[in-house]
């Protein structure tokens, strides 16, 4: 992965002319994540309220990104817990879609598109949280993997799960079908105009193949 850099040259620099120029690292994203304040329960109106505050008070200082954390597809979301076993909001391919009770502008298949548009009009960016892997619900229903002849049970690794969030199974590392699943998921998120993804549960023990398959 290549990370772009910017180069700044100081005209008063007394170093030799052939010395490497100093390189400034890009700053990390600056913004706000909904988890600490809302857990899994944030609503569309609360996102917009925080976006307006950021636009009015923080944007000029470089704060420009809002991230909707875990549970945006959970119709039974509560505080900072997870609703193990509850039916989640997913599409025909098992990809998570927003809970329309909390995000009413997502109705009629619009997803986060209208909300992203509203945030963009404030000069800000919108992101969401996703877990590695594939929803267990998609696997139990053996839903198709979009763009392939495969189904969820063909690509899932049911032995490789998260210890603290039971929404997903892992995906078969290094498998073309797993890549197709991630591609389809990211295609949907990108179609909504999202700017940022927080990909969670990428922790020890690390599996380089699974990290690599997340790059789409």
Please describe what each predicted stretch is.
Residues 33-54:
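Hydrophobic alpha-helical membrane-insertion signals
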Residues 216:
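Conserved small/polar residues in nucleotide/adenosyl-binding loops
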Residues 50, 54-118, 122-209:
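Aromatic-lined carbohydrate-binding/catalytic grooves of carbohydrate-active enzymes
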Residues 1-35, 41:
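Mature N-terminal, pre-catalytic/accessory segment of carbohydrate-active enzymes
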Residues 213:
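Active-site core of glycosidic bond-cleaving carbohydrate-active enzymes
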């Amino acid at each position: 992965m290549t990370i772009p850099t910017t180069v700044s040259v100081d005209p008063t620099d007394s170093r030799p002319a052939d010395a490497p120029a100093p390189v400034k690292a890009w700053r990390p994203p600056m913004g706000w994540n909904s988890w600490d304040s809302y857990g899994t329960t944030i609503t569309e109106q609360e996102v917009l309220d925080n976006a307006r505050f950021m636009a009015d008070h923080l944007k000029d200082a470089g704060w420009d990104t809002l991230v909707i954390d875990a549970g945006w597809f959970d119709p039974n979301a509560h505080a900072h817990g997870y609703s193990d076993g509850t039916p989640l909001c997913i599409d025909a391919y098992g990809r998570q879609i927003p809970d329309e009770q909390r995000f009413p502008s997502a109705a009629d298949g619009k997803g986060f598109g209208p909300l992203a548009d509203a945030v963009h009009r404030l000069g800000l960016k919108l992101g969401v949280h996703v877990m590695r892997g594939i929803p267990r619900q998609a696997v139990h229903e053996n839903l198709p993997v979009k763009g392939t002849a495969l189904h969820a049970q063909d690509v899932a690794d049911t032995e490789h799960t998260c210890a603290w969030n039971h929404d997903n199974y892992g995906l078969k590392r290094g498998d073309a079908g797993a890549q197709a699943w991630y591609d389809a998921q990211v295609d949907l998120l990108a179609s909504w105009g999202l700017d940022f993804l927080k990909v969670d549960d990428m922790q020890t023990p690390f599996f380089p193949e699974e990290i690599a398959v997340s790059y789409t």
